[in-house]
Swiss-Prot record:
It catalyses: L-aspartate 4-semialdehyde + pyruvate = (2S,4S)-4-hydroxy-2,3,4,5-tetrahydrodipicolinate + H2O + H(+). Pathway: Amino-acid biosynthesis; L-lysine biosynthesis via DAP pathway; (S)-tetrahydrodipicolinate from L-aspartate: step 3/4. HAMAP family: DapA. Catalyzes the condensation of (S)-aspartate-beta-semialdehyde [(S)-ASA] and pyruvate to 4-hydroxy-tetrahydrodipicolinate (HTPA). It comes from Methanothrix thermoacetophila (strain DSM 6194 / JCM 14653 / NBRC 101360 / PT). SUPFAM superfamilies: Aldolase. This is 4-hydroxy-tetrahydrodipicolinate synthase. Homotetramer; dimer of dimers. The record marks 44, 105 as: Part of a proton relay during catalysis. GO terms for cellular component: cytoplasm. GO terms for biological process: diaminopimelate biosynthetic process; lysine biosynthetic process via diaminopimelate. The gene is dapA. PANTHER family: 4-HYDROXY-2-OXOGLUTARATE ALDOLASE, MITOCHONDRIAL (PTHR12128:SF66), DIHYDRODIPICOLINATE SYNTHASE (PTHR12128). It is found in: Cytoplasm. The active site is at 131 (proton donor/acceptor), 159 (schiff-base intermediate with substrate).
Length: 295
């Protein structure tokens, strides 16, 4: 299952700030037809930190209902009981897997990290994808802990966004004898990570250029390294544009520019600066051949 491109999708809101359920359905239906391997709702890109529990659950239910591809639902929390609740809900709603970020802010030690993920995994049979993004959480999920967690039967993959290829290499080395997948969590490192043995990406840029991202990953996995390199560099300006400001500010702004359902950001995220919005618009205009599916 964990092979290919999994866009981490945005959560569209109406002008009054409420969830845009129809817009969410339209976005997912369009993305589902672009060759992607799955969608990831309620992650960082989906503004999960500002969703109420009811909204979080509703988003998962809607995406499961309308998606033609597997759904990997974000269910992480820095409260283990809350993560268990959200993970069980995702399983009951019909999600195909759950993505769990490392507990943030309270910065658990390695024993706490292991026990957190073990407890969540034991609470449900749903496949679990670990998510390591220390720049956001303040805590590092070290390769040796990942290796221990990979021995738990339903912990089956990791989204690795540490930015360290050394770490990625070590995780793949330590889990080589397990049925355990490594997915890139950094669009700009997807190709290098594939070279180390990763099998796909949970992607931001695939929201706006899904087919090109899919082609890049598939080209590499099929052995066409030259074509994968060409697409890596072709996508590079768009990848940089997606991170002109904190994710998901640029990608949500891009969706608005492309005519997709987006709506406002929720505070404390604020609109892009005029300067960066102009840069983003320029990149989208120049790369319209890659974003045509999302117009």
């Amino acid at each position: 299952m964990f092979r290919g491109v999994f866009p981490a999708i945005i959560t569209p809101f109406k002008d009054d700030g409420s969830l845009d359920e129809d817009g969410l359905r339209r976005n997912v239906e369009v993305l589902s037809k672009t060759g992607i391997s799955g969608v990831v709702p309620c992650g960082t890109t989906g503004e999960s930190a500002t969703l109420s529990h009811e909204e979080h659950k509703k988003v998962v239910e809607i995406v499961v209902d309308c998606s033609d591809v597997p759904v990997v639902a974000g269910t992480g929390s820095n409260n283990t009981s809350e993560a268990i609740e959200l993970t069980r809900h995702a399983a009951d709603a019909g999600a195909d897997a759950a993505l769990l970020i490392t507990p943030y802010y309270n910065r658990p030690n390695e024993r706490g990290l292991f026990e957190h993920f073990r407890k969540v995994a034991e609470s449900s049979d749903i496949p679990i994808v670990l998510y390591n993004v220390p720049k956001r959480t303040g805590v590092e999920l070290r390769p040796d802990v990942v290796a221990r967690l990979s021995e738990i039967s339903n912990i089956v993959a990791i989204k690795e966004a540490s930015g360290s290829l050394t770490q990625v290499s070590r995780i793949i080395e330590l889990t080589a004898d397990k049925n355990f997948a490594v997915l890139s969590g950094d669009d700009d490192l997807t190709l290098p990570m594939l070279a180390l043995g990763a099998t796909g990406v949970v992607s931001v840029v695939a929201n706006v250029a899904p087919r090109a991202t899919v082609e890049m990953v598939n080209a590499f996995l099929d052995g066409n390294i030259t074509r994968a390199q060409e697409l890596h560099y072709r996508l590079a300006p768009l990848v940089r544009a997606m991170f002109l400001e904190t994710n998901p500010i640029p990608v949500k702004t891009a969706y608005r520019m492309l005519g997709m359902a987006a709506g406002p950001l929720r505070l404390p995220l604020a609109p892009m600066s005029d300067e960066n919005e102009a840069k983003l618009r320029d990149v989208l205009t120049k790369m319209s051949d890659l974003t045509g599916d999302m117009r």
